[in-house]
């Protein structure tokens, strides 16, 4: 889990656009963040399994 200070820091608008980076809105993880949902792959998978993301279901082929 990320520190609270890092979560707050990520929400602020940076002075230079190159300093901006995505961070998961739920857990604060900086890697593997899905831009469309603004959450990391781990939280995305958890929410999808719980049925909290509409229209999302496990793929099977």
Curated annotation (Swiss-Prot):
Coiled-coil annotated residue ranges, if any: none
Cofactor dependence: Zn(2+)
A biological process from GO: translation
A Pfam family: Ribosomal_S14
Keyword hit for Ion transport: no
A molecular function GO annotation: rRNA binding
The UniProt record lists the keyword NAD: no
Any single GO CC term annotated in Swiss-Prot or TrEMBL for this entry: small ribosomal subunit
UniProt KW keywords: Metal-binding, Ribonucleoprotein, Ribosomal protein, RNA-binding, rRNA-binding, Zinc
Cofactor annotation remark: Binds 1 zinc ion per subunit.
Annotated positions binding Zn(2+): 24, 27, 40, 43
Assembly and interaction partners: Part of the 30S ribosomal subunit. Contacts proteins S3 and S10.
Assigned protein family: Belongs to the universal ribosomal protein uS14 family. Zinc-binding uS14 subfamily.
Chain's role: Binds 16S rRNA, required for the assembly of 30S particles and may also be responsible for determining the conformation of the 16S rRNA at the A site.
HAMAP family (alphabetical): Ribosomal_uS14_2_B
Protein name per the record: Small ribosomal subunit protein uS14
Species this chain originates from: Mycoplasma mobile (strain ATCC 43663 / 163K / NCTC 11711)
Gene: rpsZ
């Amino acid at each position: 889990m990320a520190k609270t200070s890092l979560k707050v820091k990520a929400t602020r608008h940076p002075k230079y656009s190159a300093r901006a980076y995505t961070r998961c809105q739920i857990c604060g993880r900086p890697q593997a963040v899905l831009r469309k949902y603004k959450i990391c792959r781990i939280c995305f998978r958890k929410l999808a399994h719980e049925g909290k993301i509409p229209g999302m279901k496990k793929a099977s082929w």
